[in-house]
């Protein structure tokens, strides 16, 4: 798995790294020359996330936005020991990918957390089935990049 998203704190001192394999977000010194998840100077900032963290974004107020990939993690975890997930990787069409990894309507598609104390400040919910692949805060809005959207959806924060 590995790093799937990066965000720099507003003061430029901390780099946040989302880790799909560990389902966590690491906080590391931005000036470190070499980093290993869980290694020297690497702190688990958020653990036990409800989905697999993807893109990260931090705004000027220090809020960290996290998008989730494969948020139907309960399905993946329940079936992790089956031969279905141990076979050869095959290309799957978009319809199959959405059924396996998409977010159901009204599921949290992204969340916001205060980088000052790690408290959750907001959850943003999917209006329709799908998934978020990127987030980007701009002033009082957060924009979400999705694979199937014609327009860039946003939410006021």
Go through each PLM region and give its residues.
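Blade-edge beta-strand/turn elements of extracellular beta-propeller
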Residues: 1-2, 26-49, 117-127
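Beta-rich, blade/repeat-based domains predominating
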Residues: 1-14, 47-61, 107-108, 127-139
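Conserved beta-strand positions in repeat-built beta-propeller and related beta-rich domains
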Residues: 8-9, 15-22, 66-70, 100-105, ...
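Structural signal for beta-propeller blades
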Residues: 23-25, 72-74, 110, 150-153
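Loop/turn-rich, solvent-exposed surfaces of beta-rich toroidal or solenoidal domains
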Residues: 50-124
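Blade-level signature of beta-propeller repeat domains, shared across WD40, Kelch, NHL, RCC1
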Residues: 132-157
């Amino acid at each position: 798995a590995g790093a799937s998203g990066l965000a720099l704190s507003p003061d430029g001192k901390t780099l946040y790294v989302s880790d799909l394999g560990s389902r966590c977000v690491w906080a590391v010194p931005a000036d470190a020359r070499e980093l290993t998840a869980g290694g020297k100077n690497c702190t688990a900032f958020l653990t036990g996330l409800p989905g697999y963290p993807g893109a990260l974004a931090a705004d000027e107020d220090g809020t960290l936005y996290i998008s989730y990939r494969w948020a139907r993690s309960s399905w993946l975890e329940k079936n992790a020991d089956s031969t279905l997930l141990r076979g050869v990787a095959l290309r799957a069409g978009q319809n199959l990918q959405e059924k396996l990894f998409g977010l159901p309507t009204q599921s949290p598609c992204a969340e916001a957390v205060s980088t000052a104390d790690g408290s959750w400040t907001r959850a943003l919910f999917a209006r329709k089935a799908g998934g978020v692949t990127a987030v980007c805060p701009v002033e009082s809005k957060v924009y979400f990049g999705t694979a199937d959207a014609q327009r860039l959806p946003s939410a006021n924060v």
